[in-house]
C-alpha cells in the first residue's frame, strides 16, 4: 500500500504525476521549437537572404510573398491556387479579338506650343481635349505620350529587336531601385514565344552592370538571364515614379508590335508560365484585359486617404485630384457597381492589345500625366468614364498573391514633394514638377471650392 505524505497524497501518486508531467513537458518543448522554426522561416522569407532561401518560401507551387518593408504591418496575405491548365504545350492560342468598338486609333504627336517651350512627353492636353477623349467613337485620335522630341528614346539595336515581339513579358527599373529577378517555371514553349523585356533608364543600367552579370550579344543587345535590357534615354519626367509609368501603362506604344503583354513591377519574380497566365485570365473568359482586385481598398477616396497617410504624394495635390473626380461624377465604390472594385493591384497588368484596351491605356496614362503619378487613383476614374465599352476581368487578390515573389527595393524611394502638406510649401521650396502633373497647376474650368470629398471609413488598418 502506498505511503501518504503530510498533504494526504500518496508517494506513489506523486511519482506517477511526475512521470505524467514529462510528456507534457516534451509537448510544450516541441511546440516552442516549432514556433521558433516558423519565426525563422518567416524572417528568412522577408530578409535579403530570401534570394538564397527561396526554396523555403515556396510550397506546392504556391508562392509565399516576402513582405515589403515599406508597407505597414498587415495580416498574412491570403493565397490560393491559380486554376491554370497543367501543360503550357496544350494551350491553344486563339484568334485575336476583333476591334468592334474603336476600329481605328491614332495619336497626337505634336502640340501647339510657344516657340521657346520645350516639348512635353505627355503633351499639353487642354481640359476640352481631355473631355472629348472620353467620348468613344469608331475613329479616335488622342494624346498618348511620346510627343515628338520629348524623350524616352530607345537605342537602335533595341528598336530593331522588339520588331519581332508579339508576345511580351515587360517590366521596368528606374533610378536604380531594383535589379532584375529571373522568372521561374517558364516552359520551353514560352521561352521561345515571349520576349522578356526589362525597360531601364541610364541610372539603372549603370547600377545593374555594377551588381549583376550583364551579357552583350553579337548585335550589342544587353541581357541579364532571360531579360533583354531596353534602355530609355532622356527620361521624360523629373519624378522617377512617373518615368516608370511609361513602359507600364504605355506598353503598346513602346512595343507597338505586341499582340499580348504581361506587365510585372521590377521588384517582382514571376512564378507562373506566361502562356498559362494568358489562358487563365484572358482567353478562358474571352477577356482582353485583366487586373487583380486591391487587397485592401475598393474606393478611390479610401486609396487617396491611404496615399496621404503614407506620404506617397503631396496631400493637397491628392485632394485636388479627388475633388476633380468627385465633381465629375465619380462616386465612392459600392456593391451596386459593375466592377468588384475601383482600385486594382496595378503591379500586374495582363492585356490583349485591342484598340479599346489601347485607348484605355492612353486615357489612363493621360490622367497620370495630368495629375498625380499614383495610378491607382486614376484607374477607376477612367473605367467609370468608359462605361460598358471596356469589359475586363478583375480577378481575386489571392490568385494575384500566387503569381510572384516580391523582393525588396535596393533602397527606399522618396521625393520631397511626397512630404509636402500645403500648396505654399510646394511653391516656396520649388517642389513643383516641371514636366508632369501640370493639370494640378492649370486653372480648372469649374469652381471646386465648395466640393467636399466623401467621408472615408478605413476598411483595413493595413491599408
Positions of PLM-derived features:
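Glycosyltransferase catalytic domains, chiefly GT-A lineage
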Residues: 2-463
Amino acid at each position: 500500500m502506498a505511503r501518504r505524505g503530510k498533504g494526504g497524497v500518496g508517494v506513489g501518486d506523486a511519482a506517477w504525476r511526475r512521470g505524467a508531467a514529462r510528456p507534457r513537458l516534451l509537448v510544450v518543448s516541441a511546440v516552442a521549437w516549432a514556433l521558433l522554426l516558423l519565426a525563422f522561416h518567416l524572417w528568412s522569407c522577408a530578409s535579403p537572404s530570401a534570394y538564397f532561401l527561396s526554396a523555403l518560401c515556396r510550397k506546392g507551387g504556391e508562392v509565399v510573398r516576402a513582405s515589403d518593408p515599406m508597407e505597414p504591418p498587415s495580416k498574412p496575405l491570403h493565397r490560393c491556387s491559380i486554376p491554370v491548365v497543367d501543360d503550357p504545350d496544350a494551350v491553344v492560342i486563339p484568334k485575336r479579338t476583333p476591334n468592334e468598338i474603336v476600329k481605328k486609333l491614332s495619336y497626337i504627336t505634336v502640340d501647339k506650343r510657344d516657340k521657346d517651350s520645350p516639348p512635353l512627353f505627355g503633351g499639353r492636353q487642354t481640359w476640352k481635349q481631355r473631355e472629348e477623349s472620353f467620348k468613344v467613337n469608331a475613329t479616335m485620335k488622342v494624346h498618348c505620350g511620346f510627343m515628338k522630341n520629348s524623350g524616352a528614346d530607345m537605342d537602335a539595336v533595341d528598336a530593331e529587336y522588339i520588331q519581332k515581339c508579339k508576345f511580351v513579358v515587360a517590366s521596368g527599373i528606374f533610378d536604380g531601385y531594383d535589379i532584375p529577378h529571373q522568372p521561374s517555371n517558364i516552359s520551353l514553349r514560352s521561352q521561345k514565344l515571349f520576349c522578356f523585356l526589362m525597360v531601364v533608364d541610364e541610372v539603372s543600367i549603370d547600377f545593374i552592370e555594377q551588381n549583376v552579370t550583364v551579357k552583350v550579344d553579337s548585335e550589342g543587345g544587353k541581357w541579364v538571364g532571360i531579360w533583354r535590357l531596353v534602355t530609355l534615354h532622356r527620361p521624360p519626367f523629373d519624378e522617377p515614379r512617373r518615368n516608370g509609368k511609361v513602359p507600364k501603362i504605355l506598353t503598346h506604344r513602346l512595343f507597338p508590335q505586341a499582340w499580348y503583354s504581361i506587365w510585372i513591377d521590377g521588384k517582382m519574380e514571376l512564378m507562373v508560365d506566361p502562356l498559362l497566365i494568358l489562358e487563365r485570365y484572358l482567353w478562358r473568359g474571352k477577356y482582353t484585359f485583366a487586373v487583380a482586385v486591391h487587397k485592401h481598398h475598393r474606393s478611390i477616396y479610401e486609396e487617396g486617404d491611404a496615399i496621404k497617410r503614407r506620404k506617397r504624394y503631396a496631400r493637397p495635390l491628392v485632394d485636388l485630384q479627388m475633388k476633380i473626380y468627385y465633381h465629375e461624377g465619380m462616386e465612392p465604390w459600392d456593391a451596386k457597381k459593375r466592377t468588384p472594385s475601383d482600385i486594382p493591384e496595378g503591379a500586374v497588368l495582363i492585356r490583349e492589345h485591342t484598340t479599346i484596351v489601347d485607348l484605355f491605356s492612353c486615357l489612363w496614362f493621360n490622367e497620370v500625366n495630368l495629375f498625380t503619378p499614383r495610378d491607382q487613383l486614376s484607374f477607376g476614374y477612367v473605367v467609370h468614364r468608359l462605361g460598358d465599352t471596356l469589359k475586363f476581368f478583375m480577378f481575386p487578390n489571392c490568385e494575384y498573391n500566387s503569381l510572384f515573389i516580391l523582393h525588396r527595393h535596393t533602397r527606399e524611394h522618396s521625393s520631397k514633394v511626397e512630404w509636402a502638406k500645403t500648396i505654399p510649401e510646394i511653391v516656396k521650396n520649388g517642389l513643383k514638377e516641371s514636366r508632369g502633373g501640370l493639370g494640378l497647376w492649370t486653372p480648372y474650368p469649374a469652381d471646386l471650392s465648395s466640393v467636399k470629398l466623401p467621408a472615408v471609413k478605413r476598411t483595413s488598418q493595413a491599408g
